[in-house]
């Protein structure tokens, strides 16, 4: 779950939320929900962040992520998590998200599959970052690697579209300067 646990993880998770919002703008076919009548496409990226609370889980929403800076996203997440923990979230603060993120990485979990939060059609599972040796310009270097998994409702999002989302997400998260474009 996305929770405030340290300054480093706070920076990391707000970047993930921002990158997901930017990615949804570039791959709007993933910013959808399935209904019995049709697939509903959303214009704004309203990201639900999973928060563990006593007795379960709740998913407060950071709305219009694509329009906000990382510091604004961070302050909203902090406020929403606090309200979730205190049981003071208003219904409109946890209903109506268009996409979810679940982060078990903060518990050291490297890889997992998250369950879609209906009526949304996708959820991004974020695993723990780990330092591993990689090859860069024919040299072995230590890199921070994070596993993410995208679960999609295939009635609304085809596998190829989900793969496109992950490609764009990877490109942006690995090139942070793209967040400001």
Identify the role of each PLM range.
Residues 6-181:
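C-terminal catalytic/motor cores of large multi-domain enzyme assemblies
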């Amino acid at each position: 779950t996305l929770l405030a646990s340290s300054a480093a993880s706070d920076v990391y998770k707000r970047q993930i939320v921002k990158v997901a919002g930017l990615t949804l703008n570039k791959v709007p076919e993933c910013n959808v929900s399935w209904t019995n009548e049709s697939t509903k496409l959303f214009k704004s990226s309203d990201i639900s962040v999973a928060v563990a609370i006593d007795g379960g889980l709740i998913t407060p929403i950071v709305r219009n992520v694509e329009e906000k800076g990382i510091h604004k996203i961070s302050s909203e997440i902090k406020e929403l998590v606090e309200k979730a923990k205190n049981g003071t979230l208003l219904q409109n603060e946890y209903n109506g998200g268009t996409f979810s993120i679940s982060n078990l990485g903060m518990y050291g979990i490297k890889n997992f599959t998250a369950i879609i939060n209906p009526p949304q059609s996708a959820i991004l599972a974020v695993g723990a970052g780990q330092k591993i040796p990689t090859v860069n310009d024919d040299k072995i270097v230590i890199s921070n690697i994070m596993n993410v998994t995208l679960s999609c409702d295939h009635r609304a999002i085809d596998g190829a579209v989900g793969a496109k989302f992950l490609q764009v997400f990877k490109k942006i998260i690995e090139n942070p300067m793209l967040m400001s474009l």
